[in-house]
Amino acid sequence: MTIPFDHWPEWPQHSDRTRRKIEEVFQSNRWAISGYWTGEESMERKFAKAFADFNGVPYCVPTTSGSTALMLALEALGIGEGDEVIVPSLTWIATATAVLNVNALPVFVDVEADTYCIDPQLIKSAITDKTKAIIPVHLFGSMANMDEINEIAQEHNLFVIEDCAQSHGSVWNNQRAGTIGDIGAFSCQQGKVLTAGEGGIIVTKNPRLFELIQQLRADSRVYCDDSSELMHGDMQLVKKGDIQGSNYCLSEFQSAILLDQLQELDDKNAIREKNAMFLNDALSKIDGIKVMKRPPQVSRQTYYGYVFRFDPVKFGGLNADQFCEILREKLNMGTFYLHPPYLPVHKNPLFCPWTKNRYLKSVRKTEAYWRGLHYPVSERASGQSIVIHHAILLAEPSHLSLLVDAVAELARKFCVTH
């Protein structure tokens, strides 16, 4: 049975309130933070304060993308040529390319089989005298083990940058994702639970890092200390010059959308979490299906993607691409909504640093080096797992039952008993 597409929630979602926020920007005559002072605080600063409050930290800097957020975090920490940064082998390529973009070397570590987050037990063996930081990624709907990662980082005097591109609002031991390490980096790209189409956010508790990150994203400028002294038409950004910056500023339109979307984030995350628990219970009853582990330290779990694993032997030798193709046809879902996990970075055709002369000179690694790496858990994950986009978790439970029924039907069709 194929069901109509309109049963599934679309993403992103907006309302009249969203449109009114955008209209405010049009009417303000200030469309960027590099615009002039109008007597009203910029949308960018309003959003930065709101997101900092949401996460319980003093400092927040919006920027152009999650990729940029990671790169600026690395630059603020002084990481560059000759340095190494530990990253998981299973993640979107931006985690690794951000390291390359500061002329440092990403060093891959495999992930845990039941969370798909970096395996802390494997981090220690990857540390060298060149290692400067660890970037744990909170992937799909899981959080990396921040207790163990921070312990390792402290032991070896390493920085921790949390890649929270897929984890806005998750909570580990009463701390929001992004606030547990030195810096948290978020993405607001179209598919994310907090989106403006594109965008990124950086949070930190460190005032000096905040100063540097502000300058790195705004051509070495910062907001002036006292806006009350500004006249209409004055520039609110002032020269600083502590560190060479570039222009990675978020527009006022994007900031307005994020400010609006943030109001509903916790409520929508709660719906996703409840429906994910329903799927966990229902899918775990199907022979050959395993759901992902939720560590006891996680009190709130944000689902960018709901992931389940299947045993290819019990499903007639199907791989993840074939499994997805059958489910998409049955459920009338496009590839945006249902797909396998990423290929491991070292096997992903989108990761090709040897094609840029800059990277060959800075990290000096060839295609044979990258493609010759081997991380078994990450490599199995891409062939034996299914990712369902978080928008589907906003559907009615009766519609989610159709998803469970489709997987169960597939299990019956291909079931191999032992």
Swiss-Prot record:
Pathway: Metabolic intermediate biosynthesis; 2-deoxystreptamine biosynthesis; 2-deoxystreptamine from D-glucose 6-phosphate: step 2/4; Metabolic intermediate biosynthesis; 2-deoxystreptamine biosynthesis; 2-deoxystreptamine from D-glucose 6-phosphate: step 4/4; Antibiotic biosynthesis; butirosin biosynthesis. The lineage of its organism: Bacteria, Bacillati, Bacillota, Bacilli, Bacillales. It is an enzyme of class 2 (transferase). This is L-glutamine:2-deoxy-scyllo-inosose aminotransferase. The modification N6-(pyridoxal phosphate)lysine is found at K192. CDD domains: AHBA_syn (cd00616). Belongs to the DegT/DnrJ/EryC1 family. L-glutamine:2-deoxy-scyllo-inosose/scyllo-inosose aminotransferase subfamily. Its EC number is 2.6.1.100, 2.6.1.101. GO terms for biological process: antibiotic biosynthetic process; polysaccharide biosynthetic process. The gene is btrR. Its cofactor is pyridoxal 5'-phosphate. Catalyzes the PLP-dependent transamination of 2-deoxy-scyllo-inosose (2-DOI) to form 2-deoxy-scyllo-inosamine (2-DOIA) using L-glutamine as the amino donor. Also catalyzes the transamination of 3-amino-2,3-dideoxy-scyllo-inosose (keto-2-DOIA) into 2-deoxystreptamine (2-DOS).
